[in-house]
Every structure is written in structure tokens, then in C-alpha cells.
């Protein structure tokens, strides 16, 4: 389900896919993809790059230490989110294991501080999970956003990029747009023009 990482991410030259500004889960799903030229990238391939992605999206603070086990958990959830997106786009039933994985992420942390009592301070609100479990909070936030996207009005706009082999996801924010970037759109149009020229020359 996961793709190998490359040293120099071609993703750096690509803008976020349409809709990523409204849904972090869309950008999360697109942290691994194959682009039209056949290049692949994985922005969660290592703890440092995974940490940068979380910090860039305000899902944690730069002082949090991220380990490989945490990056692996992020990659695993990403695979399940991508599977749910693909099922929605294809109009088929989602994989049960992916539903379970997203629900587990959703319930891994409380949605609000709990009520606690101690003799010195009396009643107060406390977080049930310490700050060293910041990844749990980040994954819960991503899972909640994915659930909101898949069950909300934007679900009908969810699409896979139509410029094979690119497999990024996007929201069709403008008409019938089916490309995740201008680069993919230009490539698809060029391929169609080339095919038409070949047809007329035969």
C-alpha cells in the first residue's frame, strides 16, 4: 500500500491539491504518491520529514520528538485514509480494516479535557494523555477531518487525479476539474493532443 521514498521529493515543486486548504486529511493522503513522470515520493518516510509535515500543519509543536514507530503509525493511517478515499471515488464499499483504523484513531484521545479533583486545587480540567503522546492527538485530528470529508458535502467533490499514473486525491473545486495540479492537467491535455494527431495521420 505504501510507496518507496525518494531522496529529493518532487512533491516540493507541486502545489497542494485543490481542497487541501479545507481538509488537512487530503494533504495527508497525498504525502505519498506517484506523479505523471513516474516519480514517487513519501513525505512521511522518515521521522524528521514526518515531524516537518505535522508542524507545518499545526498538528504538533517543533519541540516534540518523533520516533520511527510514530512515523510508521502515520504511514499506516495514511494507507487506510487513501483506501477510504479510493472506495468513495470508485463508489464501492470501504474496507472494514480501514474503517476500524480510522475509528481507532478517533477514539485514541478524548475530545475534551476531563474533569479531575485534587486536594490542593479542587476541581479542574486535565488532559487524559500527556504531551509525549502528541502523535495520538495529531492522528485523531486527521481521522476526524477524514470522517468529516467522507460524510459531508465535500464528499461528492472528492476525486483521484485523472493524469495517470499520478494518484493524488483532490476536491473538484472548479467544475469538472480532474487534475491535482496544472502540471498534471497540461500533461493530460498534451497526451490527448498527441493521440489525436496519431489518429489523423493513420
Predicted ranges, named:
Residues 175-187:
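Cysteine-rich micro-motifs
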Residues 144, 188-191:
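A broad detector of short, well-ordered amphipathic alpha-helices
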Residues 192-202:
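Contiguous alpha-helical segments
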Residues 1-160, 168-169, 200-202:
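Short helix-coil boundary/hinge micro-motifs
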Residues 160-165, 182-183:
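Short, cysteine/histidine-rich loop/knuckle motifs that typically chelate Zn2+
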Residues 165-170, 188:
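Cys/His-rich microdomains that often coordinate metals
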Amino acid at each position: 500500500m505504501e510507496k518507496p521514498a525518494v531522496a529529493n521529493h518532487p512533491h516540493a515543486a507541486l502545489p497542494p491539491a485543490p481542497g487541501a486548504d479545507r481538509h488537512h486529511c487530503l494533504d495527508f493522503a497525498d504525502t505519498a504518491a506517484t506523479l505523471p513522470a513516474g516519480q514517487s515520493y513519501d513525505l512521511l518516510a522518515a521521522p524528521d520529514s514526518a515531524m516537518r509535515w505535522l508542524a507545518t500543519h499545526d498538528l504538533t509543536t517543533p519541540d516534540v520528538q518523533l520516533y520511527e514507530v510514530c512515523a510508521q503509525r502515520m504511514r499506516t493511517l495514511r494507507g487506510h485514509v487513501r483506501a477510504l478515499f479510493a472506495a468513495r471515488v470508485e463508489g464501492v464499499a470501504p474496507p472494514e480494516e480501514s474503517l476500524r483504523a480510522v475509528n481507532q484513531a478517533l477514539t485514541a484521545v478524548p475530545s475534551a479535557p476531563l474533569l479531575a479533583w485534587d486536594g490542593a486545587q479542587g476541581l479542574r480540567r486535565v488532559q487524559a494523555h500527556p504531551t509525549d503522546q502528541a502523535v495520538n492527538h495529531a492522528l485523531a485530528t486527521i481521522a476526524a477531518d477524514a470522517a468529516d470529508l467522507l460524510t459531508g458535502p465535500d464528499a461528492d467533490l472528492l476525486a483521484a487525479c485523472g493524469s495517470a499514473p499520478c494518484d493524488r486525491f483532490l476536491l473538484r473545486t472548479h467544475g469538472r476539474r480532474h487534475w491535482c495540479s496544472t502540471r498534471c492537467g497540461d500533461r493530460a491535455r498534451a497526451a490527448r493532443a498527441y493521440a489525436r494527431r496519431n489518429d489523423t495521420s493513420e
